[in-house]
């Protein structure tokens, strides 16, 4: 019997013999009141975070968070009767959330506004009163203290979607995808310089200089980069380490039941296996994961289940298993790289430790797990329980260039 299997069996037995309690948050404990609210900044006491778009843990002491600006900090309203809708209808009730941050935050849904921070036609409210476009890139330390704010870049963001550092880049450039601007930004590690922009701002397309609402990035060990493109696009684009366009693949599918290999709708998540160089693509519109070689040759696929399944992103860590965040079921899902389902955890709610709209997640070198949630408008931190079964923890990341 292997040491890993023996440890897993022992841990399972120990948890099974624990008296009382229950398994709410999988193998984790929630770190409450992390990070500090943006309202703690001087003069900002009336505002809180907008929709949580992305999170990336460079280290346990430097965690990047993306928000769609800020929302008014309002206490939960008292329950009231909605007599215009019916005699016994009231809201909010029980533990149900009362404000959906992704609807309330700028720029709203659908296509981008005309300028960064401008609302779309479907957004209802007054800018500066019901939402404001500030503090889109915030960095916290291990204790949740806000240690950096890259407010100088708010003006070039319209809907920041994803943030990460290429794990094979010793200079640790920071990459941010903005799906409404249709571009990918490459910043210096300290955020002082915008070093590269891939894509043409506000001009859609499907080539080496145009995207159609791109969503996520993934890198191979030689820094080859793959772009999931995207909400409206139906392809994967491949670039070399300098940002030179190499090739792309993917054709428009017919959702929600497209079965043809290489046809996609809403390409919203991508991950790579550094050993085999396989590319795992979340074909969100058709509820499946498609697997390709690095040049787009179709290899395999598996279904992510029927409604309410709604996979938002993929991640492959150091243990070479694939984790997916399911916004529809509010669960984290674990698979082997052949698509065999292994484990899941998660609970819906806007209370501390619950999930509501997980749109990004990350793991640091100590195994702490972070989520960014568009609906609840927050980023959360989870700490592994003492003696937690390693097989139930989201794998630590690959950091080969930083060791």
Which residues does each predicted region cover?
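Sec-dependent N-terminal signal peptides
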Residues: 4-13
């Amino acid at each position: 019997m292997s040491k890993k299997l023996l440890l897993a069996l022992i841990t399972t037995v120990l948890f099974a013999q624990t008296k009382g309690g229950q398994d709410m948050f999988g193998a984790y404990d929630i770190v409450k009141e992390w990070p500090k609210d943006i309202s703690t900044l001087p003069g900002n006491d009336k505002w809180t975070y907008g929709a949580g778009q992305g999170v990336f843990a460079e280290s346990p002491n430097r965690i990047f968070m993306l928000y769609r600006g800020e929302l008014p900090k309002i206490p939960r309203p008292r329950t009231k009767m909605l007599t215009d809708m019916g005699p016994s209808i009231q809201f909010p009730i029980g533990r149900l959330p009362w404000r959906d941050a992704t609807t309330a935050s700028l720029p709203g849904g659908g296509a981008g506004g005309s300028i960064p921070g401008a609302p779309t036609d479907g957004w209802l409210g007054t800018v500066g009163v019901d939402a404001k476009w500030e503090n889109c890139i915030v960095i916290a330390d291990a204790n949740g203290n806000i240690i950096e704010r890259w407010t100088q870049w708010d003006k070039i963001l319209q809907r920041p979607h994803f943030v990460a550092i290429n794990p094979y880049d010793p200079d640790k450039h920071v990459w941010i995808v903005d799906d409404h601007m249709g571009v990918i930004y490459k910043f210096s590690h300290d955020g002082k310089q915008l070093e590269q922009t891939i894509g043409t701002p506000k001009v859609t397309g499907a080539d080496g200089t145009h995207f159609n609402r791109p969503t996520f990035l993934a890198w191979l060990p030689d820094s080859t980069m793959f772009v999931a493109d995207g909400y409206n696009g139906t392809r994967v684009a491949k670039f070399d380490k300098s940002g030179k366009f190499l090739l792309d693949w993917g054709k428009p599918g017919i959702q929600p039941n497209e079965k043809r290999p290489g046809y996609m709708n809403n390409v919203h998540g991508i991950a790579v296996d550094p050993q085999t160089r396989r590319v795992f693509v979340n074909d969100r519109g058709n509820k499946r994961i498609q697997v390709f070689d690095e040049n787009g040759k179709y290899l395999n696929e598996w279904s992510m289940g029927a409604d309410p399944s709604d996979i938002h992103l993929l991640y492959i860590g150091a243990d070479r298993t694939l984790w997916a965040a399911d916004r529809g079921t509010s669960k984290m899902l674990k698979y082997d790289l052949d698509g065999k389902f292994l484990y899941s955890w998660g609970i819906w709610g806007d209370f501390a430790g619950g999930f509501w709209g997980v749109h990004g997640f990350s793991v640091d070198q100590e195994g702490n797990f972070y989520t960014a949630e568009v609906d609840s408008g927050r980023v959360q931190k989870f700490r592994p329980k003492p003696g937690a079964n390693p097989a139930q923890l989201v794998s630590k990341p690959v950091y080969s260039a930083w060791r």
